[in-house]
Regions:
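Short, amphipathic alpha-helical interaction segments positioned at domain boundaries
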Residues: 434-461
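Short, cationic-aromatic polyanion-contact patches
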Residues: 182, 306, 428-444
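Basic amphipathic alpha-helical segments that dock to polyanions
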Residues: 392, 409-417
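C-terminal scaffold of the Radical SAM
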Residues: 46, 53, 76-100, 106-401, ...
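A short, conserved structural fragment
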Residues: 415-425
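Flexible, acidic/Gly-rich N-terminal and inter-domain linker regions that tether
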Residues: 1-54
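Amphipathic alpha-helical substructures
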Residues: 404-405
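Local cysteine-cluster metal-coordination motifs and their immediate loop/turn environment
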Residues: 58-74
């Protein structure tokens, strides 16, 4: 498939609105507390008939310091002793979850996110993985995708070696920006040398994929400064890159209130940074996967996209499409059978549920057939930039143009604007429309039509 991308400033300005990132459909905004532990247990029981492989997401929320841009659920503390009471509850939740699933189901994907997963000690990392392997069957290294988010300030060569022995074969390194002025403005001082040491250790230990995360739109960023960061990152030659748009939502995320809004780059500068990023990364041979993600052409993500097997979930793009996802730990979200379920958001509530022997689900949603159909359509578009009407009709027993009649006028306008090619066979997102894939997906989002605009979502660019 053609994986090229074109930066069209006029189109971007015309379509630059707020919208979901579609790590799920329906999005978490639609979750309800009417969905609780009983509904989750029922979904797990139904899922056993499929024999699908499992994916485990562990949320380790602790951070030594707060990055002011952060929108994650985290606990900022210098007190490392807080980790053990949390891990004790995670072990108990693993036992509760394990009892819900057939023993023959294999874990093909595992991810530690945060927070800062490496906040915990090496002994605690060992114990967590030992417990996981005791309770669940993990696929061999050649098959399994076992990843961890790394703060290079919180890891060294010994930590990296341990993680590889524990079975991790992928890591993402948080960088955001190497400019010291920007780092000071967001309270994340991190040298290039710290990042390079961890990256080189990961390569030496045989990690199969190393990703670097950047953010554009942070205070005091400039085109020239971010280009210097890009040049340095390209020298590191990671397998993947994520370049996220900073969403300044201080009314929702308290740490962001410590950012001086007057120091944020104006919209035009953000767009210039984005254009520079696209030009530099694609010029260096990286493929635009979609939704802020780039990969080397021989990386598994790029190959899966070429082969039509790429998938997207709460962990981002994935090559493991057919897994039931178990969310472990505070605020984690899982996807089991035709449901999404989210754990308690506060440590106190999470601990109380676990101590009482309850699965700590406090909200979620059971998808209707329409939800599942629309999720399939959105996933096909967001992963492959192509939608074959006949394939959707065969899979769901519908007549596409009749079922989605309300979407056709909006699609027609997008065709006129050069975002997509629309004909009787389907939709093909053109190079000018790839940066705006969220806009194309929003056409098929039944929930947005019931709202006064996509409230609470970040800008698409």
């Amino acid at each position: 498939m053609d994986q090229s991308i074109t930066f069209d400033l006029d189109l971007i300005k015309r379509y630059d609105q707020s919208g979901p990132r579609y790590t799920s459909y329906p999005t978490a905004v639609e979750f309800t507390d009417a969905f609780g532990e009983a509904a989750y247990r029922a979904a797990c029981a139904r899922s056993n008939a499929s024999g699908r492989p499992l994916s485990l997401y562990f949320h380790l929320p602790f951070c030594d310091t707060v990055c002011f841009y952060c929108a994650c659920n985290k606990v900022a503390t210098k007190d490392r002793s807080l980790a053990q009471p949390y891990l004790d509850r995670v072990y108990r939740e693993l036992e509760l979850q394990r009892a819900l699933f057939d023993g023959e189901r294999v874990v093909e994907q595992l991810h530690w996110g945060g927070g800062t997963p490496t906040f915990v000690s090496r002994d605690q990392m060992q114990a967590l993985m030992d417990t996981t392997r005791r309770l669940f069957r993990l696929a061999d290294d050649e098959v399994g995708e076992y990843s961890i988010e790394i703060d290079p300030r919180e890891a060294d060569a010994q930590t990296v070696a341990l993680l590889r022995r524990l079975g991790f074969n992928r890591m993402s390194l948080g960088v955001q920006d190497f400019d010291p002025k920007v780092q000071k403005a967001v309270n994340r001082i991190q040298t290039e040398e710290e990042t390079l040491r961890v990256l080189e250790a990961a390569r030496a230990e045989g990690f199969r994929s190393i990703s670097i995360d950047l953010i554009y739109g942070l205070p005091l960023q400039s085109v020239a400064g971010f280009e210097r960061t890009l040049e340095r990152v390209l020298d590191f030659a990671p397998d993947r890159l994520s370049v996220f748009n900073y969403a300044h939502l201080p009314q929702r995320f308290m740490p962001q209130r410590r950012i001086n809004a007057e120091e944020l780059p104006p919209p035009q500068v953000k767009l210039d940074i984005l254009q520079t990023t696209i030009d530099r990364l694609t010029g260096a041979g990286y493929v635009y996967i979609g939704m802020d993600h780039f990969a080397r052409p021989d990386d598994e993500l790029a190959l899966a996209q070429q082969q039509g097997t790429l998938y997207r979930n709460f962990q981002g793009y994935s090559t493991h499409a057919n897994c039931d996802l178990l969310g472990i730990g505070v605020t984690s979200i899982g996807k089991v059978d035709n449901t999404y379920a989210q754990n308690r958001r506060s440590l106190e509530e999470y601990y109380a549920d676990i101590d009482a022997g309850r699965i700590p689900v406090f909200r979620g949603i059971e998808l209707t057939r329409d939800d599942e159909l629309r999720r399939d359509v959105i996933t096909r578009l967001i992963c492959h930039f192509v939608l074959d009407f006949a394939a959707v009709e065969d899979a769901w027993g519908i007549e596409f143009r009749r079922y989605f009649a309300d979407a056709l006028p909006k699609l027609g306008q997008m065709q006129a604007d050069g975002l997509i090619e629309l004909d009787a066979q389907g939709i093909r997102v053109l190079p000018c429309g790839r940066l705006l894939i969220r806009n194309v997906c929003m056409v098929f989002d039944a929930y947005l039509a019931t709202k006064q605009g996509p409230v609470g979502f970040s800008k698409v660019i």
